[in-house]
Each structure stands twice: as C-alpha cells, then as structure tokens.
Amino acid sequence: MKEQKLATKQNQVTEAALEVHKNMGLGFGSEEYGWALAYEFGLRNIPFERKKNVKLSYKGAVAGEYNLDFVIGNSLVVSISTGDHLTDMDEAKLKSILRAIKMKTGLTVNFSKDILEIRTV
C-alpha cells in the first residue's frame, strides 16, 4: 500500500512539473521554477513543504543543515535543477541526502531541457 501511495505522489509531482515546464518554458532559475511548482502543487491539492530545513547527521552528530526544495507528504523529496543535464553527481547527492535524513525516495527535476528531465532516486 505504501508503495502505491508513493507511486501516486511521484505521478502527481511529474504531472505538476510537466505543467510548469509547458507553461514557463526554458531559461529561468530554480527559484522561479520552485515558486511555479509550489503554486501548481497548491492548485492540485498536493501536500508539500518548501525549503524544508533538515539536519544532516553523522553517527548521531549534526554534520550540517540542508534546505530541501520540496518534501511531498513527508515521504518524497523533490530537488529542482536548472543545469544543462542531470548528472550522476546530482543523483549521488540526492541519495546521500536521503540517507542522511532517513528517507527513501526522491525525484530530481531538471527544467532546463526541451523535454523535462526527471530522475527517481
């Protein structure tokens, strides 16, 4: 059941991101796409937190803090990218963050391509 709910959230995020990409096009920064995506989540009644500050831990000690672009329903992290393309390093970074905050699934969304680029981690 949890996997089905997570898949539904992933689909909702993907559809919202596609709508933002279709309407805004290319050339903006992550702040602008983030604002538009938050607005689209609101229109679609998708529960989210934006710029959620989390503590990164190492062996029980706080190793630093990180602001997540979005957390959807306390189970899905969404990271926004506006680079030329998503890289293995983008994926590795999100995996490390997920591990540090004890979450399992994340999406990296790149708005700077003609075709929206999304990777699931």
Language model segments and positions:
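Nucleic-acid nuclease catalytic cores
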Residues: 81-121
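Interdomain/boundary linker segments immediately adjacent to catalytic/signaling cores
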Residues: 1-24
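Active-site metal-binding core of divalent-cation-utilizing nuclease and nuclease-like domains
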Residues: 26-75, 83, 113-121
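Conserved beta3 VAIK motif of the Hanks protein kinase fold
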Residues: 78
